[in-house]
Amino acid sequence: VAAIQTVLG
């Protein structure tokens, strides 16, 4: 996924 990496930082 990609949206998850955004919240991870």
Swiss-Prot record:
GO biological process: cellulose catabolic process
Description of what induces expression: Induced by Co(2+), Ba(2+), Mn(2+), Mg(2+) and Cu(2+) ions. Repressed by Hg(2+) ions and methanol.
MF annotations from Gene Ontology: cellulase activity
pH dependence of function: Optimum pH is 4.0.
Any one Gene Ontology cellular component term annotated for this protein: extracellular region
Comment on activity versus temperature: Optimum temperature is 30 degrees Celsius.
Reaction catalyzed: Endohydrolysis of (1->4)-beta-D-glucosidic linkages in cellulose, lichenin and cereal beta-D-glucans
EC primary class: hydrolase
Localization, UniProt: Secreted
Function, in words: Has endoglucanase activity on substrates containing beta-1,4 glycosidic bonds, like in carboxymethylcellulose (CMC).
Record EC number: 3.2.1.4
Protein name: Endo-beta-1,4-glucanase
The entry's keywords: Carbohydrate metabolism, Cellulose degradation, Glycosidase, Hydrolase, Polysaccharide degradation, Secreted
Domain of life: Eukaryota
